Amino acid sequence: MAAATMALSSPVMARAAPSTSSALFGEARITMRKTAAKPKPAASSGSPWYGADRVLYLGPLSGEPPSYLTGEFPGDYGWDTAGLSADPETFAKNRELEVIHSRWAMLGALGCVFPELLARNGVKFGEAVWFKAGSQIFSEGGLDYLGNPSLIHAQSILAIWAVQVVLMGAVEGYRIAGGPLGEVVDPLYPGGAFDPLGLADDPEAFAELKVKEIKNGRLAMFSMFGFFVQAIVTGKGPLENLADHLADPVNNNAWAYATNFVPGK
């Protein structure tokens, strides 16, 4: 169950995207922006990821994509069996949710794997398995970040929740509102202070980065789902599960665990 493959770059089948404008992100958001500069095109002509001649979900074996999937947005591979992209307003909302969750999943997958990787290479900083580290907040002694009580010592899950709501609510509000002056046109890719390295300065490179982001984000969401299932079924971290599988793939695989798993035991 080696789910930590978020760095792959092969195309992933995904919900595709209809043509829509930034106004579909909600009337309330548009009124919060004081300026509305024309957004840059998604990509130049000739890109393999955009337009009518883009890469499709089954390559040359793909059927004709629905008429509303024009290849305007990153991650559109012409596949929408359930018709989730048929309604432009519904699609605009789902597209935003997918991008935001993709970003959180990429951060989460890294946070699940990296501490365990360090621990397996001799770095000592307390509990390395992601779900076991988090559960320490419910112990009598509380949780020490990085195993060091002099850094951050947390004892209340409610306090952590409140801090998260305030901090993340402020950042999300800033993003959705278009910055302090409401000058950002696209809340999904706000740029400015959210792009200190200037990765979006080149339109063609930026269009390709959008594709890489959504592809890796979709893989990361599957990875996080796999990490949760592994934690419930095996009680081990993702790297330990990977090591067990490589050592004995016949007895340590998804099918073997699924046929022997008994909830609560």
From Swiss-Prot:
The N-terminus of the protein extends into the stroma where it is involved with adhesion of granal membranes and post-translational modifications; both are believed to mediate the distribution of excitation energy between photosystems I and II. Photoregulated by reversible phosphorylation of its threonine residues. InterPro entries: Chloro_AB-bd_pln, Chloroa_b-bind. This is Chlorophyll a-b binding protein 1, chloroplastic. Belongs to the light-harvesting chlorophyll a/b-binding (LHC) protein family. Chlorophyll a 3 binds at residues 136, 146, 213. Chlorophyll b 1 binds at residue 57. Gene3D superfamilies: Chlorophyll a/b binding protein domain. Chlorophyll a 2 binds at residue 101. Chlorophyll a 1 binds at residues 79, 85, 98, 218. It comes from Oryza sativa subsp. japonica. The keyword Metal-binding applies.
